[in-house]
Amino acid sequence: MLTAKETDMARSLFSSTAAPCLKCHATGDPQHDKAATAPNLLLARGRLKPDWVERWIIDPQGISPGTSMPSDLFRRENNRWVFAGPTPPSFQGYDKDHTRLLVDYIFQLTPEEQRRVVAAMGRTQASTQPSGSVRQDVSLSDPHGAASAGDSR
């Protein structure tokens, strides 16, 4: 469970201008979702495993070459993954893994929290129901998160 400070930090990554997750991910808002190219993250908890989502966030191109999600959002630093873009001052002194922070946030994401982020980003409000809209041309290898041999995480 994330602390209130960690939730705020994760929210700032999730909605950053350097990597605005909801720019591409469906939100349940029909107007937004008709152009969305990625699944609604409210569906992650019921369909995916956290370790797989973390691997996807770190290197989506390695899992599905050609996907529109970039693989350079995080970089390895001192045995942890850190956001490659600018981070707010609240991240000073935070020595934990940024990808894990974001994954934990995604797996705790609620419709209310998603609406809060959408509103803060100046978008129309998302519905309370997750949209099932997912690009069908992207094959997500091992979406249930079985770790590959040699995976140290």
Regions found by a protein language model. Give the residues of each.
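Electrostatic cytochrome c docking/interface patches
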Residues: 1-16, 114-118, 143-153
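C-terminal capping alpha-helices of c-type cytochrome domains
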Residues: 1-3, 73-134, 140
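Long, ordered, helix-rich scaffold segments
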Residues: 4-7, 12-15, 43-47, 71-72, ...
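Sequence context surrounding c-type heme c attachment/ligation sites in exported
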Residues: 7-22, 31-34, 50, 92-96, ...
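The canonical Cys-X-X-Cys-His
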Residues: 10, 17-28, 53, 69, ...
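Sec-exported extracytoplasmic/periplasmic mature domains
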Residues: 15, 46, 58-62, 74, ...
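Periplasmic/extracellular electron-transfer cofactor-ligation site
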Residues: 15-38, 62-65, 111-116, 148
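Gly/Gly-Pro-rich "capping" loops immediately C-terminal to redox-active cysteine motifs
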Residues: 22, 26-56, 68-82
